[in-house]
């Protein structure tokens, strides 16, 4: 895209360019993401489809096509941890200071039923798969998926293709087989796999009832759950077409006849994704890896976060069909949910945030009770870092339960939405109350400290996780940054609503430290570039002394942007912090933290490292089928490698956000354009990117010349 000097010409060209994008949407080639078959390692190597409730992963090999089908609302809601009066903040601080490890940990235990196997917590359930046997010697060779239409293809050795589509309108997945290729679907519920005998049967589950073949051309199964409404899967085939649907409720799946045909589902998919890309941000980068990371990642974000769908947890709707998903498939609020939803902001897909926000706000009675027991107030909200879709604490990790930045981060997300979308009514009716209640908990935690305020005790996420003494400390920089972000947002929100800000919020801004500061950062030898300047600590007196996957002590840089670079020695402190962080390296990193690192490099003005981090994320944490993993798939970048068993969507969505941040990034509230784009990128551009002031902008950098203009 060529930059034009005159704004009128630029606007016309952008309109034309948007039309071209909707038709072609090529990225750096034809826009299609490719797969080589066989893909038999695990389901996450497959092509991904979703309608925001049901997820389908298409994989397999030879003459066997596998459709792993999951649902984002498949919970066994039994168990969980209710907040107790003994889990009050004063008691926790006192026990920790006294070294009473067993007493403190005992506050956060519950008793599981006999034969339960593991902690007594809610968890997400697998649903099952449909296995399609191809006839006539057909062999799968490769697959493609177009992120701009949502349509996929599977290629056979003879050149024929199986077409794939999923519709958010019809809530159905469809296949169209080529002429002359016979196919035979078979239903395989999760209860037919080893997970049933090992984990589900001891917990009181019955086997799903399969009804394949009772009606010609139809099949599926229904599954009665011990404590939740039943689930079902059904498929119907006619001629060359086969349609798969899922649902919940007492009505048997046999009664659910798929009515849509492939043509309808195909056209609905194309129409939906055309609107999605027209409404949101688009980029052009000269790096084919990053172009694919953005295009396919934004597609998967849009697929799993439908405005009329179910809020996405760690894996969205893409759950394995033969095991219980890692970490219960829960909502992790100490970074993971935030990363999953981060593309909504710069990407301009604000409506995709609303199911998440409405779910959290529906928990307010429970969160208020949590705050009452945690710190003795009637007007607070306390959100544990790990919960199910009803806000029930998934317990066992005490530092996560008391991590109040989980609530503060979501409050800041809600206010960020208000700024981007201009939704003052939502601020007035819901968000402002949640922000105030969240701040009230912080205010109850604070204590006087020689004329300043302090947080007596708190966690820095995942720092020394199981170490009773070292996992928490005084004035965690992560908590300080979250508290300041919330205070500033509340002050701004009050102004927006025509109210006077609470004096206590102003006091937080004046007297609470922005971060815990070390006298110096030590490490390495003089010969190898020892870092000796001052920097940000994890806690008071505790610096970053090893590789760490949660860059929480730098949260005041990103995501909270609370550290003013021009204030006092802050610039030097940030330089020392960045140098020490670089020194500690990537040896204990996991997938979701690498895109965050890219954004931190962008913030520091290190464009080469920002881009390289995203390439490393793709190279080390994604499998051959572009599945996003928690642990490294390949050696050489980190020691956190346990194979391909843990898929999470946080890294993939955060990578999309990091690509946008290469081009549009805020420092001290001021937007910097192309800060993360290397000089050797001679032509790079973005379209329709959203800013916090409600504007949409497009821009380009051609041969070093930057031009940016408003879109609407």
Positions of PLM-derived features:
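Bacterial N-terminal signal peptides that target proteins for export
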Residues: 1-9
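Catalytic cores of secreted or luminal carbohydrate-active enzymes
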Residues: 112-135, 649-692, 696
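Active-site core of glycosidic bond-cleaving carbohydrate-active enzymes
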Residues: 78, 84, 333-369, 399-424, ...
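Acidic/polar, glycine-enriched structural segments that form the non-catalytic walls/loops
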Residues: 23-330, 349-354, 360-369, 498, ...
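Short, well-ordered beta-strand segments enriched in hydrophobic/aromatic residues
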Residues: 173-179, 483, 697-699, 706-711
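Bacterial N-terminal signal peptides
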Residues: 8-19
């Amino acid at each position: 895209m060529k930059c034009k000097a005159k704004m009128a010409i630029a606007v016309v060209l952008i309109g034309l360019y948007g039309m071209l994008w909707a038709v072609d949407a090529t990225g750096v080639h034809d826009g299609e993401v490719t797969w080589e078959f066989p893909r038999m390692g695990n389901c996450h190597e497959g092509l991904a489809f979703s309608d925001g409730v049901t997820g389908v992963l298409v994989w397999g090999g030879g003459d066997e096509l596998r459709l792993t089908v999951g649902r984002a609302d498949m919970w066994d809601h039994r168990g969980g941890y209710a907040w107790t009066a003994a889990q009050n903040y004063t008691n926790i601080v006192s026990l920790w200071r006294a070294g009473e490890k067993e007493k403190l940990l005992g506050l956060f235990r519950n008793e599981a039923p006999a034969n339960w196997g593991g902690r007594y917590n809610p968890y997400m359930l697998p649903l099952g798969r449909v296995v399609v046997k191809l006839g006539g010697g057909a062999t799968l060779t490769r697959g493609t998926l177009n992120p701009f239409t949502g349509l996929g293809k599977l290629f056979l050795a003879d050149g024929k293709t199986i077409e794939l589509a999923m519709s958010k309108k019809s809530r159905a997945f469809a296949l169209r087989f080529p002429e002359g290729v016979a196919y035979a679907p078979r239903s395989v519920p999760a209860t037919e796999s080893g997970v049933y005998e090992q984990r589900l049967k001891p917990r009181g589950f019955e086997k799903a009832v399969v009804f394949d073949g009772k009606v010609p051309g139809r099949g599926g199964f229904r599954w009665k759950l011990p404590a939740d409404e039943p689930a079902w899967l059904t498929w119907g085939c006619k001629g060359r077409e086969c349609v798969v649907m899922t649902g919940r409720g007492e009505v048997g799946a046999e009664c659910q006849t798929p009515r849509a045909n492939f043509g309808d589902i195909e056209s609905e998919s194309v129409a939906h994704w055309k609107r999605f890309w027209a409404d949101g941000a688009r980029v052009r980068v000269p790096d084919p890896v990053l172009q694919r990371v953005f295009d396919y990642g934004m597609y998967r974000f849009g697929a799993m976060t439908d405005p009329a769908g179910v809020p996405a947890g760690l894996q969205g709707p893409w759950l394995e069909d033969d095991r219980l998903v890692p970490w219960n498939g829960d909502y992790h609020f100490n970074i993971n949910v935030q990363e999953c939803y981060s593309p909504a902001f710069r990407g301009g897909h604000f409506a995709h945030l609303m199911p998440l926000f409405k779910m959290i706000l529906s928990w307010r009675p429970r969160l208020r009770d949590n705050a009452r027991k945690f710190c003795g107030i009637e007007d607070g909200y306390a959100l544990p870092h790990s919960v199910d879709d009803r806000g029930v604490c998934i317990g066992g990790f005490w530092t996560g339960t008391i991590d109040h930045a989980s609530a503060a981060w979501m409050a800041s997300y809600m206010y960020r939405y208000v700024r981007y979308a201009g939704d003052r009514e939502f601020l007035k009716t819901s968000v402002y109350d949640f922000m105030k209640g969240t701040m009230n908990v912080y205010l109850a935690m604070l204590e006087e400290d020689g004329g300043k305020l302090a947080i007596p005790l708190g966690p820095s996420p995942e720092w020394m996780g199981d170490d009773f003494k070292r996992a928490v400390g005084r004035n965690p920089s992560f908590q300080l940054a979250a508290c300041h972000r919330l205070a500033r947002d509340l002050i701004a929100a009050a102004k927006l609503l025509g109210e006077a800000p609470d004096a206590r919020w102003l006091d937080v801004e004046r007297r609470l430290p922005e971060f815990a500061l070390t006298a110096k950062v030590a490490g390495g030898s003089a010969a190898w570039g020892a870092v000796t300047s001052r920097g940000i600590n994890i806690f008071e007196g505790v610096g970053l002394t090893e590789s760490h996957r949660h860059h929480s002590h730098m949260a005041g840089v990103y995501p909270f942007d609370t550290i003013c670079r021009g204030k006092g020695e802050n610039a030097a402190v940030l330089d020392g912090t960045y140098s020490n962080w670089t020194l500690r390296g990537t040896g204990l990193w996991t997938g979701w933290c690498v895109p965050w690192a890219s954004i931190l490099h962008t913030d520091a003005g290190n464009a080469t490292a920002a881009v390289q981090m995203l390439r490393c994320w793709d190279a080390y944490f994604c499998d051959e089928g572009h599945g996003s993993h928690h642990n490294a798939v390949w050696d050489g970048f980190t020691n956190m490698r346990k194979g391909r068993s843990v898929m999470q969507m946080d890294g993939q969505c955060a990578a999309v956000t990091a690509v946008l941040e290469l081009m549009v990034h805020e420092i001290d509230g001021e937007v910097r354009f192309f800060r993360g784009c290397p000089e050797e990128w001679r032509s790079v551009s973005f379209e329709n990117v959203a800013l916090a002031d409600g504007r949409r902008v497009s821009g380009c950098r051609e041969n070093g010349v930057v031009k940016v203009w408003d879109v609407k």
